[in-house]
Amino acid sequence: MSKKSFILLNGNISVLIFSVLRDEFSVNYSVDKILNRVLVPRDMQEIRQWVESRYIMSYRNDIRVFFDILGVSRIEDFIEITNCVSLKDTYWVKGLNSKKHWDTVSPYRNPLNKVIADYSFNRRINGKNITGSPDFSTDGNFPKCWKRMNGEIYLLKAGSSGAINSGNEPYSEVYACKIARRLGIGVVDYTISDYKGVTVSKCKCMTNEKFGLISYRDLYRVYECDFERLLNSSKSDVDKKFLIDMLLLDYVTCNVDRHYGNIGIIVENSTNRVLGYSLLYDHNLSCIPYYMKDEDLEFYISDICAKDGRSFKDLFKLIDCTYVRHKLQKLVGYNVSIGCKRDRVVRDMVKIQLRNALKY
């Protein structure tokens, strides 16, 4: 049996020591010593699960093929080379006797690895020099990568491909952003860009070395969507208002993909203290990206549903109140536009949702 020991850190603060134990039949993990219980990652249920979450990547099914091509065959090798860095927080891992420190591995301070970014975006391998990269720990089903531009870090995310109605998802991010701003709802700013000849949505990284991000799912370990239960679990009026705003935006934009994994919560990295909900993000499946012009729009909207299975009419009933109706008045006469051929369809969608809600 072989044993390799590592230390998990938050910035330059040691949090715990763990080991990877390997024999000819299996690979096991053990937590050997907790050094700072307060700073144990909030999304850590067990050490194996946490380490594996640091290399989920967009194309998770191909991740082992990627490692094999680059000569990284064991999890111990992956940890040593990449240090399990992420843009979600300031946690990282090094060998127990390693001299590395946070300044040398931080994705906020160091160049982002182009080889890994290219693979995360288009599954192509251009070179073999890999280091720590936040692309490893960025989940989701669409091609995406992190890029540093003019001193800022941005997430670039492409749409689907291969079908007549594919590729509209990046535009949905921008439409939803504009509608949210019209409603006075806090949202990450998205724009349309081009990367390697592909249309992508572009947004600035919302985290930094002071503030990290954890999903509602990972913080509370709740996996099945139930928006009524979510509203009833609100711990304050501020939280409830946030959730109502979120569901209102989802109603207006017909967002079919609001799940607990894309409801973000801000954490103070240095203390592990939960601060509150983040800006809203990840709306690429809102604004009916797969609708085609020969379909009946009203029927199409009535036939799709929110992530917890309820119709959008029922979603509105869940949040219907004077506050919501006052917000919706801001959309009366509003013609959202991003200069795209889908402008008319999205405007008509908003009008239908307004009419269904306000009965005019």
Region spans (language model):
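Phosphate/dinucleotide-binding and metal-coordinating scaffold of catalytic cores
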Residues: 1-248, 252-254, 266-360
